[in-house]
Amino acid sequence: MKYFVAIIFAIIGLALPLELDAQNKELMRGYEKDLNSLFEQVFSTENKENERYNANEEVMVIMEEALLQRDSYKWKWKLRKGVSVLTSDDDKFRVITWAVVNDNNEFECFGYMQVLNENADVYEVCRLQDKTADIFNPGEVALTDQNWFGCIYTDLITTKYDGRYYYTLLGWNGGNMTTQHRVIEPVYFKRNS
């Protein structure tokens, strides 16, 4: 009977929603408030290009600091419109993306991924580096976080087949005044050896 009760408590414990402790909640609320304030500057058409990019540099620093916090993956971000936050159905990764528009109406995309390292049982943070201008045939190239066809992701589809999860990201890149790109991107993660 003791084993049965212990198993029930273990199962109930696994089913409870993951939450941050009070101290981490307060810390993450502070990051969220700071990020939303900075995103207002990043997306403001009244700001000059250099002001938007300077604010975005601050966003990058704060975002990375926030994502590197212990248990930050549990935080449910409420970021302003224009910032996409998508999480896979199996909770293996999350992607956060946004764009800065320059004075020529060209989009430069930015983003981060939090990916579960199952061996270490921690989420690793990857900064996505927009190399759209250098990628001439995106459909023929294997892309990485260091060589990313930048976009704002609008949907993350999780598919399970033969016991393994597969992911498809759908996105949009504003390009410039004459072009826009719709992006369909299959995603997989290599296991670190």
Where are these regions (language model features)?
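Short helix-loop boundary/capping segments
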Residues: 171-193
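Bacterial Sec-dependent N-terminal signal peptides
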Residues: 1-34
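Structural signature of eukaryotic scaffold interfaces centered on beta-propeller domains
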Residues: 79-92, 148-163
